C-alpha cells in the first residue's frame, strides 16, 4: 500500500442519492468542512439511484397498499402511511429550497406531477380499498383522494387498463392528483455537479478495499484506483457508507459492534417497458395493485407512467429475480462473503423462516416472457407481447437481523441507519421506501452522528425544511404552506391544486 495519506473531514462512500443528499446537507450546514467521495463506477447515480434501476415513484403512501394494513377488528391502520407521507414532504421541502437557492435548476428534469392510483379486483379487495379510502380521505395529508367502483369512471381515469376488460367481479380504484414521478438518477447527478462546484473531491473508479479505526479515533480507508491500480490511504473524522448493496460488506469491515449480527438477502427486479408510443400515450398515472397472497411487499405490481430523459415511458413490474450479487455491478460471491460467524445463525434462521419467499423467487425466475405478459394483461388486457420488452432493474439487499417482534433471522423490508456509538461512522442498509425519504434519513444520520452540533444547525435546518420536527398532519396551516411552496418551486401546481382547495 502506498505511503501517501490524505486527511479530510468527511468521506462519503458511494455516489448515489444518499451520499448526494448527505453531502449537500453538510455543505449547507458546515460549508467549511472538506468532503471526499469515492465511487467505484465511472459516474454518479449508476446503481440503485439510476432511473432504470428503480420505479421512480415519489413514495408518499398515496397508492402503495402495503403501507396500510387491515387490523383484526377490520379497521385500517394508516400510521405507516402517515409517517412515509410526512417523510416525503421533508424531501420535497429540501428540493424546493435547492431550486429556490439556484442549486437545482429546471425541476421538471427530476420531478413531475403524476396521479397516484390504487387498483383492486374482487369483493374483499374492493371492501378493503373502500375502508382504506374512508380512513385516509379525512386526514389532511391525503385530502383530495377519490374512490370509485364504477367501471365508467375507471375508464375515464385509466382508459388503457379498462379497454376490452371483462368485468365479472367487483373492481375499484382510488386516485389522488398530488402524486409524483421522480427521476432519482437525474437528481443524483445534479447534486453531485453542485458538490463539485463546492470543491467536494469526487473520485470515480475508486474502490474502498478496507476501513479501520486508527489509534487516535479517526477512520482510515484503503482506496484502490481501478484504472491505475494505485492504492492510497485516506483518513477522515466521519465516514458515511452509502454504497447501496455494497454497504453491508463495508460495515462489516469497519468492525463496529453495531454492525454485528446483521445479514443481507439480495433480490433483483425486472420490469417490462412498452415500445409503442401510441400505447404509452393512453396511460397517465402510477397505478399500484395488491401483492398476491404469500408474495413479499416489494412484489406489489404497478403500471407506471415514467419520464426518463424528458420522454414519456410506460413500465410494468416488478418481477422479482434472484442473484447472489449485492449490486448490479457486484460479484457472484457477495452473498457468500457476507456470511460471518456473528451473523451465521441469523442468516440460517432467516433461510428457514422465509421458505415461502424463496419459493416465490424461484417461481419468478422461471417465468417465461409469455407468463409475464399474462400478469401484465391483468392490468392491460390488450397488451401485445411484441410491444413490451423485459429490462433488468437494480439489486436490493433486504436487511436480516434478530428483532424482539420477529425473533431470530427476521427479514426487514425498510431502510435502516446503523451507526457507531460515537457517531464517527454510519451506514445505510435496506431498500424501500429508500430514495424518496433520502432527506429524512440523512437528517437522521446527521442528528445521530453530530448531536453536539444540532442546536447550532437547527435554525438552518428549519430554513431548508420548515416542517422539521413538526407533524404536518397536526398542523394544517403549516401543511398548506408547505404544499403551496413546494408546488410552486417544483412545478407541481397541477397535482397539488385539489389539496389546496
UniProtKB/Swiss-Prot annotation:
Cofactor(s), by name: FAD
Reaction(s) catalysed by this chain, per the record, are:
(S)-malate + a quinone = a quinol + oxaloacetate
Could you confirm whether the keyword Oxidoreductase appears in this record? yes
**InterPro entries, per the entry:** FAD/NAD-bd_sf, MQO
Give this protein's Gene Ontology molecular function annotations: 2-hydroxyglutarate dehydrogenase activity; L-malate dehydrogenase (quinone) activity
Keyword Translocase among record annotations: no
**EC number from the UniProt entry:** 1.1.5.4
Q: In which pathway does it act?
A: Carbohydrate metabolism; tricarboxylic acid cycle; oxaloacetate from (S)-malate (quinone route): step 1/1
Q: Which GO terms describe its biological process?
A: tricarboxylic acid cycle
Mind telling me which Gene3D superfamilies this protein's record contains? D-Amino Acid Oxidase, subunit A, domain 2, FAD/NAD(P)-binding domain
Provide the top EC class: oxidoreductase
What is stated as this protein's family in its record? Belongs to the MQO family.
The protein's name is: Probable malate:quinone oxidoreductase
Write down the species.
Geobacillus thermodenitrificans (strain NG80-2)
Its taxonomic path starts at: Bacteria, Bacillati, Bacillota, Bacilli, Bacillales
